[in-house]
Swiss-Prot record:
It is a multi-pass membrane protein. Residues 2-26, 88-110, 173-178, 248-267 are cytoplasmic. A motif (NPA 1) lies at residues 93-95. Belongs to the MIP/aquaporin (TC 1.A.8) family. TIP (TC 1.A.8.10) subfamily. It holds the Pfam family MIP. The gene is TIP3-2. The chain crosses the membrane at residues 27-47, 67-87, 111-131, 152-172, 179-199, 227-247. InterPro entries: Aquaporin-like, Aquaporin_transptr, MIP, MIP_CS. This is Probable aquaporin TIP3-2. Predominantly expressed in developing seeds. Also expressed in rosette leaves. A motif (NPA 2) lies at residues 207-209. Gene3D superfamilies: Glycerol uptake facilitator protein (1.20.1080.10). It is found in: Vacuole membrane.
Length: 267
């Protein structure tokens, strides 16, 4: 479904719920979220397995482990967004979808479809991980010892704000021009960098689906609300600021004629 530079708030067209484009986009979100969560959570389980087998018993709680987890997430998200961006816009994250909804770049119907697909993809990824690893329990996310829930919430807000800001500047902004080509790479890099910053404090989820899948399959619900509220607040703030303070009004005359129109992505 092609979009334009003009914001369009609404529930969605009557035929959107059954339109083939909606079904294809929803399937793309499901598959890409599955790929991302399987690789991201799988990297944590793999490191834990390696450290336990060598009697180190430290898992990802080392500088090297943190770097490897950040790299795995960055690479997996780069691949997942690249795979879906021409079909669904490559959200792969309920917070990104919420930001696009708040910014008038996606309909309510499409947002609901994406949320369901993202959550199911994350759950299935963790179920298959548990099966493939002979019952290893997904780790998920929790606030580190000595870090309060309020600090964890603030961390998630800031990290997700940065993520959605990069999404907007490279994949949504009508003025982005050729920089849109590197959108998947930029999105993967900011997630990897954010994990290096927030990982030791709250795990740096930035993605409610990424947190929900392991929480459900591993039945680990400690501090779980943070990983919904924080990303949704951070994503919404980034969307509102970028939409109304950075993207020019449709009535504002351009400075030059080389601005590119918004690509036909479903943001």
């Amino acid at each position: 479904m092609a979009t334009s530079a003009r914001r369009a708030y609404g529930f969605g067209r009557a035929d959107e719920a059954t339109h083939p484009d909606s079904i294809r986009a929803t399937l793309a979100e499901f598959l890409s979220t599955f790929v991302f969560v399987f690789a991201g959570e799988g990297s944590i389980l793999a490191l834990d397995k390696l450290y336990w087998d060598t009697a180190a018993h430290t898992g990802t709680n080392t500088p090297g482990g943190l770097v490897l987890v950040a790299l795995a997430h960055a690479l997996a998200l780069f691949a997942a967004v690249s795979a879906a961006i021409n079909v669904s816009g490559g959200h792969v994250n309920p917070a990104v979808t919420f930001a696009a909804l708040i910014g008038g770049r996606i309909s309510v119907i499409r947002a609901i479809y994406y949320w369901v697909a993202q959550l199911i993809g994350a759950i299935l990824a963790c179920l298959l991980l548990r099966l493939a690893t002979n019952g290893l329990r997904p780790v998920g996310f929790h606030v580190a010892s000595g870090v309060s829930e309020l600090h964890g919430l603030l961390m998630e807000i800031i990290l997700t704000f940065a993520l959605v800001y990069v999404v907007y500047s490279t994949a949504i902004d009508p003025k982005r021009g050729s920089i849109g080509i590197i959108a998947p790479l930029a999105i993967g890099l900011i997630v990897g960098a954010n994990i290096l910053v927030g990982g030791p404090f709250d795990g740096a989820s930035m993605n409610p689906a990424r947190a929900f899948g392991p929480a459900l399959v591993g039945w680990r619900w400690s501090n779980h609300w943070i990983y919904w509220v924080g990303p949704f607040i951070g994503g919404a703030l980034a969307a509102l600021i970028y939409e109304y303070m950075i993207i020019p009004s449709v009535n504002e005359p351009p400075h030059h004629s080389t601005h590119q129109p918004l690509a036909p992505e479903d943001y």
